């Protein structure tokens, strides 16, 4: 009873609010964690929150590329996506993971609907770094009206981070899921964006989690080399969000059962909170 009473102030704050969740890491692979995640989403939905889920799939993509004898290449945390690789990326993200997750959430009681960024021009993109990363793209436009219609009709959108390219015959673009989640959160004026990861949050030089950061803190940590690899695009996304209308961004440990509920409905929360240097 105490847990429920303690959560009431947070339920009042978040009821009716859009919460964007980037779903990835162990929570996307471990069967027990998948089930806890699904239950968290159902509870959020039943309490009147409006979850929007963008999923990754890097490990599954790498596994499929290995099976097909295609090398996985990365630069500064971004995948270099050849035409051959792009076909595999879309097959795994849109054809496998998206449908599996949608079915799984529906089974647990959410009204989930799966889609990719190609649907209704949800995500439009151009080649990142003038094509140096192949079919890895950067988002140029988001169609929020389509998503808002889906949300306001009582559905939970499950989005694969594939964007529409130039022309009908274009393969489309592979979008970093963290960046896609950020653009969607901004377009929807989301209350929060939450990134599920396989670490306890952003770690300092002693590998201890940092409870809160501002964009200037993040810049300093990058200069010191504390932040690197796949954490770079994740934190770039967080900074972009909090500087463009999203109240707070959170990086939390998806390996902890019910991590979403712990972040949203408890005073202490978990992981690292990023805010824009004003009031926390």
Curated annotation (Swiss-Prot):
Entries under Pfam families matching the protein: AA_kinase
UniProt site (Transition state stabilizer): 22, 234
CDD domains, sorted: AAK_NAGK-C (cd04250)
Binding site for substrate: 57-58, 79, 174
Keywords per UniProt: Amino-acid biosynthesis, Arginine biosynthesis, ATP-binding, Cytoplasm, Kinase, Nucleotide-binding, Transferase
InterPro entries documented for this protein: AceGlu_kinase-like_sf (IPR036393), AcgluKinase_fam (IPR004662), ArgB (IPR037528), Asp/Glu/Uridylate_kinase (IPR001048), Glu/AcGlu_kinase (IPR001057), NAGK-C (IPR041727)
SUPFAM superfamilies: Carbamate kinase-like
A biological process from GO: arginine biosynthetic process via ornithine
Catalytic reaction equation(s): N-acetyl-L-glutamate + ATP = N-acetyl-L-glutamyl 5-phosphate + ADP
Coiled-coil annotated spans: none
Molecular function terms, GO-annotated: acetylglutamate kinase activity; ATP binding
Subcellular localization: Cytoplasm
Cellular compartments per GO CC: cytoplasm
Function: Catalyzes the ATP-dependent phosphorylation of N-acetyl-L-glutamate.
The protein's name: Acetylglutamate kinase
Organism whose genome encodes this protein: Helicobacter hepaticus (strain ATCC 51449 / 3B1)
